């Protein structure tokens, strides 16, 4: 009895929660505007690439 009620509840929850489907719909950012995506990716990857160089520069200038 408890198992049946849990099964009914979970199937009704799944049925009521519908998300958009398709490529790029499960990402936490929009991929619709390619220029916005390009700017975000350049900032993200560029900052990760530049950080070690900036840290080394800071350490060299500190001494």
From Swiss-Prot:
Topology check: give the Mitochondrial matrix ranges.
17-33
Point out the transit peptide region: 1-16
Instruction: Please indicate if the UniProt record lists Nucleotidyltransferase as a keyword.
Output: no
Q: Which SUPFAM superfamilies does this one have?
A: Mitochondrial cytochrome c oxidase subunit VIIc (aka VIIIa)
| Entry-linked Pfam families | COX7C
Listed InterPro entries:
COX7C/Cox8, COX7C/Cox8_sf
**Positions of post-translational N6-succinyllysine modification:** 25
- Per the record, ranges on the Mitochondrial intermembrane side are 61-63
A cellular component term from Gene Ontology for this protein is: mitochondrial inner membrane
The membrane topology of this protein is: Single-pass membrane protein
The record's function comment reads: Component of the cytochrome c oxidase, the last enzyme in the mitochondrial electron transport chain which drives oxidative phosphorylation. The respiratory chain contains 3 multisubunit complexes succinate dehydrogenase (complex II, CII), ubiquinol-cytochrome c oxidoreductase (cytochrome b-c1 complex, complex III, CIII) and cytochrome c oxidase (complex IV, CIV), that cooperate to transfer electrons derived from NADH and succinate to molecular oxygen, creating an electrochemical gradient over the inner membrane that drives transmembrane transport and the ATP synthase.
What's the protein here called? Cytochrome c oxidase subunit 7C, mitochondrial
Q: Which gene encodes it?
A: COX7C
């Amino acid at each position: 009895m408890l198992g049946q009620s849990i099964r009914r509840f979970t199937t009704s929850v799944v049925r009521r929660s519908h998300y958009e489907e398709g490529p790029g719909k499960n990402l936490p950012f929009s991929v619709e505007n390619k220029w916005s995506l390009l700017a975000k990716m350049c900032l993200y990857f560029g900052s990760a690439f530049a950080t070690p160089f900036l840290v080394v520069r800071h350490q060299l200038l500190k001494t």
